[in-house]
């Protein structure tokens, strides 16, 4: 797809909004920043809002080209500064899922276009899907992400309104992420509760023919992993996580690893099998118990708590990283890191939600290919199931290992 380079701030049209004004959109009276013509929605308990911190990732709106309350098309430009002490940093870079979340101002755009005068507090925003393409490497501390987000159109299915969008993310004029075919809907509580989930069955899917399936580089691939073992992996202690056969990991100084602490979205791996799964090419299953006190419910969104699908995607990438490391693919790659395969489009679909009342998320990796080449790469379908409902699916996601600082 054509990539649009974000114009310089000075030439961008329309109103500008500061971080403080974004906080008002997230948790205050929206008419205070959009003007008195929006006062009619201030009384609604639930509105389409930007997230509150910590998930308010946009730092400023640098331009807005749209007719307020028109429910037509429009464009919004935002920036996100990746501070050196940002809470989400992993290996000095923004995680792939958090990077998608930073392009969150489609929420502010559709709000400015007047969606809540139609929702009237009875309907809430939920992402339905999009197509991602990463470019080059994940941005790092000190970079500023510049987003250009377009509202492309609207539709209606019965009482459900649909919203279509796309966006580009650039750093210093260089494309780093393209999101195409973005779809969101505005749903009642009843409609969300009656969701049939993602219509995808691995038994009916058709993975690629003649797959590249490099064998494990260790004899003893662990079949299960506890939370304490996953914490060890996040801490860079490869042997403490995976055990016998991974002794060489003790020599690593910057081993490829996953995020830890609150950014680790897995409690345990219940199955890891290089010959498992319905395709016989490899399988991993992990679980995460949900608590009402989980940090991501706080402010995402005000009066409408739900787990961002972008963080479910981040959890999926963690399961892929664990699978690659469990096969021994990182043993000889001290100083490397995980990142999405660039210049390939990945399709995400969301059809369920994680609420404070949810009990468990199951993450599954259905391996399609394992390629132990110059940049070891895993391709797999990813499925998240929430209390039995298939909530999230990504088709043929690609994750690879690349040299990190100081090797890059």
Locate each region found by the language model.
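Glycine-rich and small/hydrophobic secondary-structure elements
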Residues: 148-149, 364-367
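Short nucleic-acid-contacting surface segments enriched for D/E, G, S/T with interspersed K/R
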Residues: 138-146, 312, 354-362
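Beta-strand/loop-rich accessory regions of lumenal/periplasmic or secreted enzymes
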Residues: 96-118, 310-313, 317-328
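Non-catalytic linker/capping segments at the edges of enzyme domains
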Residues: 1-97, 118, 122-123, 133-141, ...
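N-terminal export/assembly segments and adjacent metallocofactor-ligating motifs
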Residues: 344-346
